[in-house]
Design a protein with these regions (language model features):
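A cross-kingdom marker for long, charged
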Residues: 246-270
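Membrane-interacting alpha-helical segments
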Residues: 5-21, 76-77
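Generic structural signal for hydrophobic core residues of well-folded globular domains
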Residues: 54, 92, 179-186, 261
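Short, solvent-exposed secondary-structure capping/transition elements
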Residues: 60-64, 101, 184-192
Length: 270
């Protein structure tokens, strides 16, 4: 099956899996396909993972129920990260690029009732992705450090790779990807969407498939992570400059969507 069609079908499958369990506002692709780093061959097959924004009920708010924030693992080991709109929008404000990327992906499903607000959200994505540049830079460097710590850690999901290569090649490729990303975002001031696709993606795919031996992989991982940290240190300013317009946009969209949903719920009760 052609790549684009395959991804579309898997994203729709995720939506269909949760649509009867939650009031889904927006479900979007996350991960390697958004970076052009997905692989489908006899040696490696990339999962299709998604994030979903869901809406609470009026009753959830009144009774102060814990907002939903969970990960669903499907039978094929693909993941759906499900988060209440309040939780997801706070993650956007925290500038974690793993969350921000869902505003830029070409693969998504929307709730047509809220189409206007979702389009407004996606059209405002670049502003939201630079809501707090210092925090975004810290997140990128932090992600690189997390991947370095995970490089040789025998997690249940990666222990086979550790035993085979002496390290997890996927973690190394993430470290290299973060270095490419932080330089485009912070030094070259490129648009966020353009930062998602690394310049050396063919090389990163080979890295992910285990190109390097353990010694070279360890050395490169440590050096590149250190470079990413140094870039962050050089770019972060003394004070965080907050893009209040981006915050206002997120708050406005959240308000409009929840107002519309609760109004509909209450009218249906009567």
């Amino acid at each position: 099956m052609e790549r684009t069609q395959y991804i579309k079908e898997q994203v729709l499958r995720h939506y269909n899996y949760i649509k009867d369990k939650y009031d889904v506002l927006y479900l979007a692709l996350q991960g390697s396909q958004n970076y052009g780093l997905d692989v489908y061959d006899k040696d490696y097959k990339s999962d299709v993972d998604t994030k979903a924004i869901i809406l609470p009920s009026f009753e959830d708010i009144v009774y102060n129920r814990q907002p939903v924030s969970k990960t669903i693992v499907l039978d094929n080991d693909e993941h759906i990260d499900v988060k209440d709109i309040r939780v997801m929008f706070e993650n956007f404000k925290k500038q974690n690029i793993n969350f921000l990327e869902i505003l830029f992906t070409d693969f998504y499903v929307i709730n047509e009732e809220y189409k206007e607000d979702i389009n407004y959200l996606r059209n405002s994505a670049e502003q939201i992705a630079r809501l707090n540049i210092n925090q975004a830079l810290r997140c990128m460097a932090g992600m690189s450090k997390e991947k370095l710590k995970a490089l040789k850690h025998p997690y249940p999901a990666t222990i086979n790779k550790i035993e085979k290569y002496g390290y997890d090649p996927k973690q190394l490729h993430h470290i290299l990807r973060m270095n490419d990303f932080i330089k485009k975002y912070g030094i070259q001031n490129k648009k966020f969407k353009d930062c998602l696709i690394p310049d050396n993606k063919d090389y990163l795919i080979q890295i992910k498939k285990g190109l390097l031996d353990e010694q070279d992989a360890t050395m490169i991982a440590e050096n590149v992570d250190n470079d990413t940290y140094n870039v962050k240190e050089k770019l972060v300013t003394e004070l965080d400059l907050i893009n209040q317009t981006a915050i206002d946009i997120l708050n406005e969209i959240k308000y409009n969507i929840l107002k519309q949903k609760f109004k509909k719920e209450l009218l249906e009760e009567n």
